[in-house]
Amino acid sequence: MSPSLFRSEEVSLVQLYLPTESARPIMSALGELSTIHFKDLNPDVVAFQRSFVREIRRLTDTERLLRYLHSEIDLNGIHVPDHNLPPSYESVLESSTIEDIIERITRLEARVRQLVESSQLLEARYLQQLEFANVLTKADAFFSKSGNTVDPLRNNYETSSIFSGEDDTTAPLIENALELGTTGTFDSEETSPQMNTTLDFVSGIIPTVKFQFLERILWRTLRGNLFIHQVRADDSLIHGAEKNEEKTIFLVIAHGTQILLRIRKISESLGATLFPVEEDAPGRTSQIQQANVSISDLNAVLENTRSALYTELTFIAEHISAWEAVLHKDKTVFQVMNLFNYDQNHKCLIAEGWCPTANLPMVQKTLRNISDLTDSQAPTILNVVHTSEQPPTYFRVNKFTEGFQSIIDSYGIATYREVNHGIVAIVTFPFLFAIMFGDLGHGAIMASVALMFVLYEKTLGAKKDLDEIVGMVFYGRYIVLLMGLFSMYVGFVYNDLFSKPMSIFSSRWVWPVKSEEAIARAVQVGTYPIGIDPTWHSADNNLLFMNSYKMKLSIILGVIHMTFCLFLSLSNYRFFKRKLDIYAVFVPSLIFLEAIFGYLVITIVYKWCIDWKAKDLQPPSLLNMLILMFLSPGTLEDQLYPGQKYLQVGLVIAALICVPWLLIVKPFVLWRRHSNEENKYQSLNSDLPNVDEADALMAVDSQEKQAEPFELGEVVIHQVIHTIEFCLGCVSHTASYLRLWALSLAHNQLSSVLWNMTLANGFRMTGIVGSIFVVILFGFWFIATCVVLVAMEGTSAMLHSLRLHWVEGMSKHFEGEGYAFTPFTFKVTAE
């Protein structure tokens, strides 16, 4: 097994001296390598006070211009080609080239913005002219009915104080105001119908939803002394408006300059657009002709402007992806360079970072190549620095192991060079899942879906618009594939196919030909080759047998899993050469676990191996045995094997001894070591000649940096917590593995109920009707199986398997005090 799989890769601290003139191309090359995790050497400097803030701000402003251009491209429905950088853009470009790109983008953005503003202005004027022409046309049609002038209206006004339309082209507010006893704004002395009046009108266009408000406000304000004519605007105005709303053309006729001024103000306050319309027919005809000429001219100019804008945006769309990538890459380089120190004396940047030791030759070769290409006067220096600082944790992963590693990293990052539980989870995670989900049919459905994702991973991986759930399943496609395959295997062992048994081999239970008993009992004539005998599925005591089998199987697998994880801690202790932890932590932990639950597993297997019927004995209860083992040592209800009580007393004593062993030995040994080291240090100081005070302070400071001060209280508290957690955890964690039995039972019963409620009813029917019902019920059964049993139950079993790894398994060895290796890379930027 590769060391980088079982343990994190060895990582070295490197120090880089980068000449300022070649820093950008060097950082570009390192970003392509994705192999150095840079440290922040300016933690106390705020972001806006760092060295390359001005460059980053300018690039950010340019990216903002690109976002604006991208939005305009999307608005115009122009396709942006896929992100394919030309060869000249593969690396960070020279400063002069970047400046040329920024200037070009700035110039294009200004040009596009000017064209957009001109287009919007022309569209507004074009729409306004359309509205004006529409108002003129409707007004001319209205006045044509009344003799082409307002004079008939004036004559009619002498006999009535209010006019309102009576057909579909007018909108009456009220019946004749004189009949209601109101005379508008006239006094009692001025209500004579024969008064001389001068009528005039206001024409315009308003959104239809606001016309009713305008009508009511005008009537109430003018007390009914007006005439309103309204008509629906043409559809061309509806589609040309930004909000795509219907509009109404209105004509308000009233008398008096002040009243007309008030009408104009009220109309404009409600969003109406007013247009001047001539009273005489020749004047209106001239206005219509002028409006049509303006519409034609504006349309021609607008088409030319749109064509120019489309041409510019098409050109930009061909290059915008490359520009975005180049600017984002250059911005990323400057952001990383802000982490470095600047040496003004040597005109160079000083960087520190973590690099996998195996990649150091590749990094050095890259630095030499870049230095040769840039003809830098000063060399680029890379030094490996020896330090006691803890490096980051780095695991090399591929598309298969990435999902499993992410599951473990979600709980915590492993300490540097600690055993990687992610490689163990490749087998244990889908296997524990399958114990709960085991069904050959359901596992086949799950494996088929995952296999489809695996076969089409290139096509699906290239898509960026995957649904959230689909994307999650695609990311964990190999996890789902293994879960399905393991479920098929466990389902084969359970002899479960959609809750139904499979008679692959003949049953090893036969019924007697003649029986004198009232209830016939089957006789076992052999052992079924593999898995559960199908006869058990139809037996009356099927549930009792399967519960007992799966419950004991859960305990066995749980103890094996915890024991294996405990041995992983031994691997850690040996690797880090912590002998004290081996005999003060691992050994008592192993004895405590195996003295209780390891012994229980052995008794379960032993009880299975004994033919109790042949011995004519009642098999003892293992649960009662385990309880009496601690509550009443040496007492047995039923003996399982000779010498049982003496062995159990010895195991109890061994388990009890392990508790103070875990609690006391490690703190005591550490305290003795620290006391001896202090005595040696004091003896050494007394034997040394007089030294300079500054040298002594430097020596003390150096020791403080290398080792943390010993605190006995912290060590004792930590060990007490660990002891209590482990001892109680052995009990609770073993019980927690019973979820394997519980979920397996629930899954099987739910599958059986679903079968009996759907397909079983269809199979009872015969003939054509039965065939039709079978097809219909199969659809219901298959959909419910996929949604409820595969998706929902599968998610539940996966979460339980996840918990068994995070808590029950990893608590036996996982320290999780590391931090992730996050190299400087352009890959995340590109995504």
Curated annotation (Swiss-Prot):
CC annotations in GO: endoplasmic reticulum; fungal-type vacuole membrane; vacuolar proton-transporting V-type ATPase complex; vacuolar proton-transporting V-type ATPase, V0 domain
A Pfam family the protein falls into: V_ATPase_I
Residue intervals on the Vacuolar side: 438-439, 502-548, 608-650, 749-769
Cytoplasmic side: 1-418, 457-471, 569-586, 671-723, 809-831
Chief location of this protein within or outside the cell: membrane
Membrane topology: Multi-pass membrane protein
Protein's UniProt keywords contain ATP-binding: no
InterPro entries assigned to the protein according to its UniProt record, in alphabetical order: V-ATPase_116kDa_su, V-type_ATPase_116kDa_su_euka
Biological process annotations from GO: proton transmembrane transport; vacuolar acidification
One GO MF term attached to the UniProt entry: ATP hydrolysis activity
TM helices/strands, residue ranges: 419-437, 440-456, 472-501, 549-568, 587-607, 651-670, 724-748, 770-808
Subunit description: V-ATPase is a heteromultimeric enzyme composed of a peripheral catalytic V1 complex (components A to H) attached to an integral membrane V0 proton pore complex (components: a, c, c', c'', d, e, f and VOA1).
Protein's UniProt name: V-type proton ATPase subunit a
Species name: Schizosaccharomyces pombe (strain 972 / ATCC 24843) (Fission yeast)
Gene this protein is translated from: vph1
